[in-house]
């Protein structure tokens, strides 16, 4: 609210799960998200260009007899052992059928939205999830799961995939979808498909230095989307070299500078990381680079990350990111808008609600 106005184009070049562009669309801005990781792109696209509830439920009803017919046609010996360990044969056959039917869709937005819904139920701890009980935030190591299933004689659940998919859709639509549609891309952040000076505000969090687990942490979701996590890992930027990281950040900042309008701001969320036994403040490393590119460094904000809020919560302080560092940059002169926000009662300003009856969990 302080850095953009209604109608502005708000860009996140590393959109991850799409939170920033979604919030932009929910608040009468045009959210644009980009991420080279396929799973991140699918989730971003689903949030800012969602299908309608009617189309989703209509497709599920259409798919029911087709899933029943196709489920028996799959030879599960063709499926990787690492995948099979998570699912009963009954459930896995349905997953394969649903995936194939989604791939055959010509409607890109509906197809993508259904993929995102499936990613949301592919694994997790509750009865809506299709796998054995596991974590939802990341795909667990198949080696660990194999040992756990064997040692504890775990029974793989039989799920009705389309029923779980429908329940997931009802929960997603319960709070409404953004009235403003955004745009999603899956390209290198150093070469965005945007015109010069076309963006009003940039907010993003580049890949943290020395954190290289994204593809592996989503290996099972990537499998569903038809990707190998090893192939995705090769495409994503990753390095243990601080010099290469600086070169990457410089190229990204150049691209942000190119697409950002004059007298506008860019907020870059970085972190403090441990390197060779010492704490490195990435803001101190990146700020001079931003100035070299042409930005003004308006301010640096420090914010501790509670362990419970970390994406990679299983890392200790020596491995992960202990503190977020927010770098506020301006291209030309920019003063944040004087807007007071009641965060306790704040609500989206542009939202569409479709009446549905949400089934109990």
What are these regions (language model features)?
Residues 198-201, 207-263:
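SAM-dependent methyltransferase catalytic-core segment centered on the flexible catalytic loop
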Residues 92-204, 209-212:
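SAM-dependent nucleic-acid methyltransferase catalytic core
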Residues 38-105, 226-236:
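Conserved phosphoryl-transfer catalytic core
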Residues 8-27, 31-38, 44, 114, ...:
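Conserved proline-anchored active-site loop of SAM-dependent methyltransferases
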Residues 101, 236-296:
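Conserved Class I SAM-dependent methyltransferase catalytic core
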Residues 1-6:
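Conserved alpha-helix/loop element of class I SAM-dependent methyltransferases that forms part
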Residues 168-183, 252-264, 293-294, 331:
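A structural motif corresponding to the C-terminal end of an alpha-helix
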């Amino acid at each position: 609210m302080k850095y953009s106005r209604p109608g502005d184009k708000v860009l996140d070049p590393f959109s991850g799960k799409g939170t920033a562009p979604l919030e932009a669309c929910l608040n009468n801005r045009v959210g644009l998200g980009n991420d080279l990781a396929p799973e991140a792109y699918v989730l971003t696209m689903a949030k800012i260009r969602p299908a309608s509830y009617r189309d989703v439920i209509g497709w599920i009803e259409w798919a029911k007899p087709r899933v029943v017919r196709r489920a028996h046609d799959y030879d599960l010996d063709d499926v990787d052992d690492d995948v099979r360990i998570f699912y009963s044969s009954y459930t896995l056959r349905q997953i394969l059928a649903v995936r194939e039917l989604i791939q055959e869709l010509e409607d890109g937005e509906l197809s993508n939205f259904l993929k995102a819904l499936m990613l949301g139920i592919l694994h997790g701890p509750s009865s809506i999830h299709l796998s054995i009980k596991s974590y939802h935030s990341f795909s667990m190591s198949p080696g660990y799961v194999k040992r756990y299933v064997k040692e504890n004689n775990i029974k793989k659940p039989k799920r009705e995939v389309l029923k779980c998919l429908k329940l997931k859709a009802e929960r997603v639509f319960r709070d409404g979808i953004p009235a403003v549609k955004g745009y999603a891309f899956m390209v290198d952040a150093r070469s965005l498909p945007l015109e010069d000076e076309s963006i009003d505000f940039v907010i993003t969090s580049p890949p943290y230095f020395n954190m290289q687990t994204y593809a592996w942490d989503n290996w099972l979701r990537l499998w569903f989307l038809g990707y190998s996590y090893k192939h995705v890992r090769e495409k994503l930027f990753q390095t243990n070299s601080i010099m290469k990281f600086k070169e990457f950040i410089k190229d990204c900042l150049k691209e942000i500078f190119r697409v950002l309008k004059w007298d506008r701001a860019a907020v870059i969320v970085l972190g403090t990381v441990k390197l060779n036994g010492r704490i490195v403040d990435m803001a101190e490393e990146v700020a001079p680079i931003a100035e070299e590119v042409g930005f003004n460094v308006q301010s640096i904000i420090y914010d501790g990350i509670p362990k419970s809020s970390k994406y990679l919560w299983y890392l200790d302080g020596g491995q992960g990111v202990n503190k977020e560092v927010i770098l506020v940059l301006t291209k030309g002169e920019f003063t944040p808008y004087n807007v007071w926000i009641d965060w306790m009662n704040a609500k989206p300003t542009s939202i569409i609600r479709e009446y549905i009856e949400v089934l109990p969990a």
